[in-house]
Amino acid sequence: MAKGQSLQDPFLNALRRERIPVSIYLVNGIKLQGQIESFDQFVILLKNTVNQMVYKHAISTVVPARPVNHHHASDRPATLEKTEE
């Protein structure tokens, strides 16, 4: 899995799991709003009054309505170990 994907998945999954409303801005300037129903490597399914399949390559920015905690234990920086001199 690429590093970019390992950042996207926990973030999008937290938004989906907690049903956090989002604003998604497309590269052409259009703003979409709703909740993330599901996603995969290429698309996000956005739910509002209708379901919309949005291709990730068309997305500029995803803005949650509130702060999101999407960090996992594996995301924490490693601590430096003391070396004996």
Swiss-Prot record:
Residues 66-85 are annotated as: Disordered. One of its GO terms (molecular function) is RNA binding. InterPro entries: Hfq, LSM_dom_sf, Sm. SUPFAM superfamilies: Sm-like ribonucleoproteins (SSF50182). Keywords: RNA-binding, Stress response. CDD domains: Hfq (cd01716). The keyword Membrane does not apply. GO terms for cellular component: cytosol. Residues 9-68 form the Sm domain. Residues 72-85 have a biased composition (Basic and acidic residues). GO terms for biological process: regulation of DNA-templated transcription; regulation of RNA stability; regulation of translation, ncRNA-mediated. Homohexamer. PANTHER family: RNA-BINDING PROTEIN HFQ (PTHR34772:SF1). NCBIfam families: Hfq, PRK00395.1. RNA chaperone that binds small regulatory RNA (sRNAs) and mRNAs to facilitate mRNA translational regulation in response to envelope stress, environmental stress and changes in metabolite concentrations. Also binds with high specificity to tRNAs. Belongs to the Hfq family. This is RNA-binding protein Hfq. It comes from Photobacterium profundum (strain SS9).
